[in-house]
Design a protein with these regions (language model features):
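Conserved lysine of the Walker
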Residues: 38
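Extreme N-terminal, non-catalytic leader segments
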Residues: 1-28
Length: 199
């Protein structure tokens, strides 16, 4: 079972691990419920550890033409996790430079190539970052969660008029993924961000 941890404790844990100068980069994967603060925590950690790179699962959506029929009902079917693993996560885990092109759903196109130098800390953040396809390229898995009421409040503030569609479409897919792969139960640590000011 995972242990509960607060962000300051996670920072201390990472600092201690990096102080040992491991031979391979430390890859921290932040998964969890939408609205739980994955991106916020990733940004906090990136500021705390400048010698790091951050990878976002949101950069690895599949173009609509490549998605399987019925993808809207299948968790993760709109993601290209194999490309994330092969082009970004595995090279970063092996201490190699990373080069990849993010796919922008807003623009409907791949963006210019992004090049990242090898760093001792790699932060992978976003939904599906604990997916079994990525097993073997991660050192530490942290699951973020918050109370349902707080999640609703945050998503309403974030999504505005798009909230109803977001809640009906994406939240069930995400919860299905958590249940199918026991994501919360198999994490190393859990961060509960329900209380304001947690991250």
């Amino acid at each position: 079972m995972p242990q509960n941890i607060a962000p300051p404790g996670l920072i201390s844990l990472l600092a201690a691990a990096l102080a040992q100068q491991p031979t391979k980069p430390l890859v921290l994967a932040l998964d969890g419920r939408c609205g739980s603060g994955k991106t916020t925590l990733a940004n906090t950690l990136a500021r705390q550890f400048p010698a790091s790179i951050t990878l976002h699962t949101d950069d690895f959506y599949q173009p609509p033409a490549q998605r399987i029929r019925g993808w809207e009902k299948t968790p993760c079917a709109n993601m290209d996790l194999a490309r994330l693993r092969d082009e970004a996560l595995r090279p970063a885990y092996e201490g190699q430079p990373v080069q990849y092109r993010a796919y922008s759903c807003r623009e409907g196109a791949y963006l210019p190539a992004r090049e990242l130098a090898a760093q001792p800390l790699v932060i992978l953040e976003g939904s599906y970052s604990h997916h079994p396809l990525l097993t073997g390229c991660e050192t530490l898995r942290v699951f973020l969660t918050c109370a349902k009421e707080e999640q609703t409040r945050r998503l309403q503030a974030r999504e505005g008029e798009r909230y109803a569609n977001f809640a009906a479409r994406w939240v069930p897919l995400e919860e299905g993924y958590f249940a199918q792969y026991h994501i919360a139960e198999t994490a190393d640590f859990v961060v509960d961000t329900t209380q304001s000011g947690t991250i």
